């Protein structure tokens, strides 16, 4: 009996928290497809797509310390 009451209270609490934290912006769902189309026309480069590398003939550290690697992928004290 106690377990059933606890389950009912937990479900009510979770349901209330979902409604409280829900987005209350007006026409938020209706504007979503329009925003997606706009984003596809002008995609923003993410940090994962950006390539940070060291140019040729510049000193490199073999990538041991988490720094940028050579653009060519070859390092022998200088980028090759």
From Swiss-Prot:
One of its GO terms (cellular component) is host cell presynaptic membrane. It comes from Conus imperialis (Imperial cone). Belongs to the conotoxin O1 superfamily. Keywords: Calcium channel impairing toxin, Cleavage on pair of basic residues, Disulfide bond, Ion channel impairing toxin, Knottin, Neurotoxin, Presynaptic neurotoxin, Secreted, Signal, Toxin, Voltage-gated calcium channel impairing toxin. Pfam families: Conotoxin. Omega-conotoxins act at presynaptic membranes, they bind and block voltage-gated calcium channels (Cav). The keyword Nucleotidyltransferase does not apply. This is Omega-conotoxin-like 2/7.
